[in-house]
UniProtKB/Swiss-Prot annotation:
GO terms for biological process: melanin metabolic process. This is Dehydratase AgnL8. The active site is at 79, 104. Belongs to the scytalone dehydratase family.
Length: 174
C-alpha cells in the first residue's frame, strides 16, 4: 500500500519526531512517554549491536533514561533532523527516513566544564510512526551511521556492555 501520506499525516509525524528528539536531548522522560506508541521497533544494531522487534514503551523509556545510556546526567546530546522522506505503509503506519546529525559530549563532572569524551554521529535514520487513538506516535527507529567524528564508539561503551548483544537487558531483543 506504500503511498504518500497527506500533509496532515506528515505534520502529525513531524510533531512526534520533534517530541522524541527534544525529549531525548532534554532528558524529559515524561514528555517522551507521551509521544511513543505502546510498542516500538528499536534497531540499535549500529551502536549497541541489538534489535528489539517489539519493545513495550515502558521498557523503552527505562532504557532511554538509564544512566548507561541517554539518562546519564553528564551526557549532552542534540538530535538534529534534516530533510525527510515519508511513505504511508498502511492507514495507521508511516515510515520516515530522516537525515540526522547527533553530537554527543560526556563531561567529567556536574560542573560541565571538562569534556571526558565526545563523539558525533552522521547519517540517516528510518523511523516508524503509528496512529494511536487519532494521534501519530513515534513507533521505532533504525539509525544508519554513515560516519562519526571523535570517539563516538566510546560514548555508549557502558550502554553497549549493558544493553548490547552480550548485555543482560532486553528480553525482547533479537
Amino acid at each position: 500500500m506504500a503511498k504518500d501520506p497527506t500533509f496532515e499525516e506528515v505534520t502529525g509525524c513531524q510533531r512526534a519526531l520533534f517530541e522524541w528528539a527534544d525529549s531525548y536531548d532534554t532528558k524529559d522522560w515524561e514528555r517522551l512517554k507521551k509521544c511513543v506508541a505502546p510498542t516500538l521497533r528499536i534497531d540499535y544494531r549500529s551502536f549497541l549491536d541489538k534489535l528489539w522487534e517489539a519493545m513495550p514503551s515502558d521498557e523503552f523509556i527505562l532504557m532511554a533514561s538509564d544512566p548507561r545510556f541517554l539518562g546519564n546526567p553528564l551526557l549532552k546530546t542534540q538530535h538534529f533532523v534534516g530533510l525527510s522522506t515519508w511513505q504511508k505503509i498502511s492507514p495507521d503506519e508511516i515510515e520516515g527516513t530522516h537525515q540526522l546529525r547527533v553530537p554527543h559530549q560526556r563531561y567529567t563532572d556536574s560542573n560541565m566544564k571538562e569534556v571526558a569524551v565526545k563523539g558525533h554521529a552522521h547519517g540517516i535514520a528510518t523511523m516508524w510512526y503509528k496512529r494511536v487513538e487519532d494521534e501519530w506516535k513515534f513507533a521505532g527507529v533504525c539509525p544508519q551511521i554513515r560516519w562519526a567524528e571523535f570517539d563516538y564508539d566510546k560514548v555508549f561503551a557502558e550502554g553497549k556492555d549493558h544493553f548490547g548483544e552480550n548485555g543482560g537487558n532486553g528480553e525482547h531483543a533479537v
